[in-house]
Amino acid sequence: MTDYLDDGCELDETGSVVPSDDSVASIGNKGYHSLEAAITEAKEGATVTLLKNVTEDVTIPANTTVTLDLNGKTLTNESSHTITNHGTLTIKDSVGGGTVDNVTHAKGALVNYGNAILESGTLTRSKEAGSSPSTSGGNSWYVVDNNKGTMTVKGGNIVSTGKFSSLIRNIGDSTTKAQLTIESGKLSNGFIAVKNDDNGDLKISGGEITSDDQAVQNWSQAEISGGTMNGAVYTWAADNSAGQMTISGDAKINGNVYSVQYVYTDNEIVHQPIVSAATKIEGGTIVGNVGAAYSGSAPNTLGVVTVSGGNFPYLYRKSI
């Protein structure tokens, strides 16, 4: 009977076909000796289930739609990014405790050039060594780099304890925007949690984002309509570009909200923003200061904050 079984399959004690004991991943009842092999063979919309803790660099090709079920196991990188996605990838964890980890300097747990959805599970960098904004410790990077991709966080955890690199970078270019939507889940970092970089489109409607520094740092277009930000929310301007932020709905921000002008000197030339960072507050609750600020020398133009709604309990307490 076993002569007729596919490679990666065996019979259990009941005679049912199951993945072989040495398989690290499966699609249905067929096992594979590497996660990459399973993904390569996956048909449109297939679910690849991790069966063991595995060390491997994985690439999702373009025009591939696949779900990765961590199944309570840990996927750790070998030398590069743990997962590089060019296709459509959903990450979930049907058991609990499943993790995508990266342990290498300048590499991430997930680099997304395609379409990625995080439903459950944890993305992290367990060897992150950044101890301050100026000290990488020789091992630091983003946990997630959404690079000209589309990513939706529907649940799960994205966590790091580092204080050198942002937790998530959302960055596009002049031809392709990056789109990051956070609907739920928990994000936590010792430094900037969500960096919405150049040509990034950020929408936050839920979840909890915690940072010892900035929960959100915005250099492009951002909307926060829900969720809880434990940390500052800053919108920045530099040179000829400026971030635009709208805060509304039932968003709660436990931290300061500022529009910041960034002034810097390069080869003895002072670079001033020629446009203003702008924050519109239409709703939500802000437990912190609200205003305009600058980094570096005094700017020629100030950031703009417009308030048409919202609750400000911290400001009220200070005025008593």
Regions found by a protein language model. Give the residues of each.
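Short domain-boundary/entry signatures in modular proteins, especially
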Residues: V18-S26, L75-E78
